[in-house]
Amino acid sequence: EAQIRSLDSERYTMLPCHSASQIYQEAGITELPMLLGFNLYNGWYGGNLGGFEEKLEELHKEFPHKPLLITEYGADVDTRIHSFSPVRFDFSCEFGSVYHEHYLPEILKRNYIVGAMVWNLNDFYSEARRNAMPHVNNKGLVSTDRERKDGYYLYQAYLKESPVLHIASKSWKNRAGASRDGKSCTQPLKVYTNADKVEVFLNGKSLGVYPVADKVVSVDIPFVNGKNVVDAVIEKEGREYRDQYVCDFKCVNVKNGFTEINVLLGARRYFEDRIAEMCWIPEQAYAEGSWGYIGGEVAPNKTRYGSLPASDTDILGTDQDPVFQTQRVGIEAFKADVPDGVYAVYLYWTELTSENKREALVYNLGNDVVREDYINRVFSVDINGVSVAKQLNIAEEYGSE
């Protein structure tokens, strides 16, 4: 520090730290730099989102005389994954949005936080990573092919003075959902804007005018089967601004207009296969006249900080890893009360347990899935009482990680 001051008295110096500030204090180095930075990931690698502002207050009490910066924060987002009950490490667009919607206002309201750096602007390659998109760190506000994620527009709504209006999840072109009547399915859709209110239209019909709080509003959209056009309209500075979202929606109902169903067992998330232009939807328990699983339980993905919503296994031979990373183990049957007819049934399997040990990734901060005791899993499959597979052993026939 003294050397830097002698060479350039105007240059600021900073020490970036992780959240365990006491380690740096005990080493006697927190008083050396002019600024202190902290990498904080409350609610992503562990804990909950509310722990972020608690940590900020704690750090301010520890270092009241130091300007503080958040030198890293972020959550991984795979733009193909969605969830209406988002949780940490599900890699959904919706959890990423919730994360930044929580962090950014907490940063802006505190004058002692003099700067913050999102980790990262762009997704980037990281060879040892697995999870939803192996070999990629997905914490960017922009994907590797420069697709802007929803969080990008949240920052614009907060930081730009010119009008901002953006319908979230615009890249989700192929949507689907369970429908009671086969004609419509209601799902929430967010709009980011720095206007006070926004009017939302579906296929030319107004759904109402909605007040905006903290630069975002969530609107329940009654999507119909087929093409949907959602328009958002604001007035700002005497001018009208519009944004539009177009998607194809498949209302899944086994009685009315049934054509297909693509289900992720063991999942609460949706996955868009953009190549096949199809959408996988979360599982549900079977009920008469409908569809769903019978028996079993969600495959555990245990870590030091609780269970994760999906395995972190790299599925070889595909880039559609999220299709294979959730399971319902011990399932007795899957039943769909579809009309009489001829159907094609595709069953996708993978073995997520393994005898092989693997090295934990240090930057996952304890969130690597703990290997369960290996089970030599063998099973058979019948469809409508007809045997289609006997004594399947996925690990033996195709291998495991």
Annotated model-derived regions:
Residues 233-237, 350:
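Beta-strand-rich extracellular modules
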Residues 1-209, 222-223, 236-237:
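Extended substrate-binding grooves/exosites of carbohydrate-active enzymes
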